[in-house]
């Protein structure tokens, strides 16, 4: 990677890090304040708040790992450092991904309209479905950490036996590609769940519109509007999720060293938790209204400061 591209990627990472933390911090703060005032919080606000906190954790852990490995590249070959950094990122990424997936499940079960008995049972127990989904995902998290640590130990043993297993060697590139393959494989599960929920929601909207046409009713009834609004939320999520998933998959097929393109791939990966959170604010009426109030307050403050300056 050229110096200019590296500087641009580093600048984008810093900007996304700031925007992502501000957006996610704003989401968490607004929902927590509303929770304290009302002394209750809805399921969707619980998911969004937990998602915002997990994304702050992911952004901070990713930024710190990149910063430490850039300033101290020799630590990349230290087994304990590799394990710690991998485990931290795996945990942060896991909760960020699975909470986002739980949000898509929520919209599907809450908005979609099917007469299937299983679907109705899941809708009636929506809170339990989300809780069980997150609990079952912990099994995948444990498996991901165990397999990754076994892979690191295998690489470490080979590194100790043979000096050619240096960090800049082809063997080390294979190590990172295999590690990436492991993480991408575990990311396939929530990605598939989200895609299924997305497709079923589209099918539900299509059936609903077909029924409206059959009964000679307009397509702008309340149920259709709710369907479309939920579908817009899920479409934005799926688009960014697909972008995130492809950014992981592309790294497996690149022929260049992962080290050379490290900043570029980090830029792609942190786009999802940063930009999608901004879209959540714009699409959520409560968060959008709170953000407009904050912007109005900042605008008034800036005008007051300008009038005080001679």
Curated annotation (Swiss-Prot):
The chain crosses the membrane at residues 3-23, 47-67, 88-108, 129-149, 186-206, 233-253, 262-282. CDD domains: 7tm_TAS2R14-like. Glycans are attached at residues 162, 171, 183. SUPFAM superfamilies: Family A G protein-coupled receptor-like (SSF81321). It is found in: Membrane. Residues 24-46, 109-128, 207-232, 283-310 are cytoplasmic. It holds the Pfam family TAS2R. Residues 1-2, 68-87, 150-185, 254-261 are extracellular. GO terms for cellular component: membrane. It is a multi-pass membrane protein. Its main location: membrane. One of its GO terms (molecular function) is bitter taste receptor activity. Keywords: G-protein coupled receptor, Glycoprotein, Membrane, Receptor, Sensory transduction, Taste, Transducer, Transmembrane, Transmembrane helix. InterPro entries: GPCR_Rhodpsn_7TM, TAS2R. GO terms for biological process: detection of chemical stimulus involved in sensory perception of bitter taste. Putative taste receptor which may play a role in the perception of bitterness. Belongs to the G-protein coupled receptor T2R family. Several bitter taste receptors are expressed in a single taste receptor cell. This is Taste receptor type 2 member 125. It comes from Rattus norvegicus (Rat).
């Amino acid at each position: 990677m050229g110096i200019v591209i590296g500087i641009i990627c580093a600048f984008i990472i810093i900007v996304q890090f700031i925007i992502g933390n501000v957006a996610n911090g704003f989401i968490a703060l607004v929902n927590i304040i509303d929770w304290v005032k009302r002394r209750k919080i809805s399921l969707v606000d619980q998911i969004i708040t937990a998602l915002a906190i997990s994304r702050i954790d992911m952004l901070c852990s990713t930024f710190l790992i990149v910063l430490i490995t850039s300033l101290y590249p020799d630590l990349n070959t230290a087994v304990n450092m590799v394990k710690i950094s991998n485990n931290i990122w795996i945990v942060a990424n896991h909760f960020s991904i699975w909470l986002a997936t739980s949000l898509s499940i929520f919209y599907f079960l809450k908005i979609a309209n099917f007469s299937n008995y299983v679907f109705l049972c899941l809708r009636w127990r929506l809170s339990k479905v989300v809780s069980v989904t997150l609990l079952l995902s912990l099994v995948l998290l444990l498996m991901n950490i165990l397999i990754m640590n076994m892979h690191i130990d295998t690489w470490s043993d080979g590194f100790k036996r043979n000096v050619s297993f240096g960090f800049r060697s082809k063997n080390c590139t294979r190590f990172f590609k295999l590690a990436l393959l492991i993480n991408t494989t575990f990311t396939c599960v929530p990605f598939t769940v989200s895609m299924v929920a997305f497709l079923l929601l589209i099918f539900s909207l299509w059936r609903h519109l077909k029924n409206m046409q059959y009964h000679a009713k307009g397509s702008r009834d309340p149920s259709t509007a709710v369907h479309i609004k939920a579908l817009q939320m899920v479409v934005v999520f799926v688009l960014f999720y697909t972008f995130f998933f492809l950014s992981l998959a592309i790294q497996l097929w690149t022929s260049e060293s992962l080290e050379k393109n490290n900043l570029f791939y980090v830029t792609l990966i942190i786009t999802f938790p940063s930009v999608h959170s901004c879209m959540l604010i714009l699409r959520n009426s409560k968060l959008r209204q709170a953000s407009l109030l904050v912007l109005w307050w900042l605008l008034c403050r800036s005008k007051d400061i300008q009038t005080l300056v001679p």
